Amino acid sequence: MAIVPERPSPRLLALISLITLATIFGQGSSSADESGASFWSPGTFANLAAIPGEPGWSFSATYFHATLMGGSNVATADTLPRFPRTTLTVQLDADIKTNVDLAILTPSYTFATPIWGGRLGFNLFIPVGTARTQIDALATGALGPIGFANQNSISDRLISFGDPAPQLSLKWNEGANNFMVYSRGGVPIGDYDPDRIVNLGDGHASWDNGFGYTYFNATTGFEFSAVSGLTYNFTNPHTDYQNGIDWHVDLEASRFLTKQFYVGAVGYTFNQLTGDTGSGATDGPFISRISAVGPEVGYLFPVGEMQGSLSLRGYWEFAAQNRSSGWNTWLAFSIAPTEKAPTVAK
């Protein structure tokens, strides 16, 4: 609906509507495609992150839900080609809401032969699911002497698969102390279209490397895990956009109340260290950061001769910059060869 102080022609109203929608599409694609989006999902690592697994195959299925809110503010001023003396000024205020529901399927294998005294593991993360984004925008401005205000809304939904991410990790155990190094890559074969508002694929390759530590006291049942890493993003060939280098830390502390049941707290921080580059980076460096905290609960149980686990954790995000924020929840089920740890002394 257009609201103007005068009664401009229908042709002018149509032009204003097109300008608003074009601006929404331009800004929406930037926000959902590259700016504020990252290959690494903060909160990926949590309980017992660095404890070596037992040799053999394992499998996990994680349900991930996120409700994110963001905003955008753009101001432009230009002349029209056919009317060089007429200046068009537009101020766009947009509210962006995104809902994401993913199933992350992860087959894994831990090798029995030690390497440098540690256990080598391979994981393949496969995300499938749906995402929906809605953008509500209000454009205000003036076309020459005529002021206008125009409100429009667009939305997009996608049900598909994202980029698979293979990972190699090496883990060591030294009593209560456990250590890990890992390397994970993003393979850009997920569903991606640079002209869509929402995508599950990134459209570019990524490489993340990091290390982790887990302290587990079998007597007290106290456990603490921290994992930190750096992400290098390759250039998106579709948009000539390259995200900057990201640094992330996942934190978790828990207490086993019984041999099987634990409660705890989780958190993460994500910081972009270098700015975005390329001809597609029309918003400039667009350095993003965010932090989060939340609760965690988990339960271990036998599945035949295997070890099953069920965990639930949630994150409330804050201190967001150039990135949508909100709540996200992880519900994970896994089955693996029986581990010697954790065993809580009672």
Labelled PLM ranges:
Residues D33-S35, L48-G56, L68-S72, F111-G121, ...:
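Short loop/turn motifs that connect adjacent beta-strands in outer-membrane beta-barrel proteins
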Residues S38-F39, T44-G162, N173, A341:
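A subset of solvent-exposed loop/turn segments in beta-rich extracellular surface proteins, enriched
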Residues A46, T89-D95, A149-S155, D193-N199, ...:
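Extracellular loop and loop/strand-boundary signature of outer-membrane beta-barrel proteins
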Residues P55, K97-L105, A137, L158-P164, ...:
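Residues that define the transmembrane beta-barrel architecture of outer-membrane proteins
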Residues F59-Y63, F122-I126, L168, V181-S183, ...:
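Membrane-embedded beta-strand positions of outer-membrane beta-barrel proteins
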Residues H65-M69, I126-R132, D163, W172, ...:
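Transmembrane beta-strands of outer-membrane beta-barrel pores
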Residues D78-P81, N236-K346:
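Outer membrane beta-barrel transmembrane domains
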Residues N178-R184, D191-A281, A292:
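Detector for outer-membrane/organellar transmembrane beta-barrel domains
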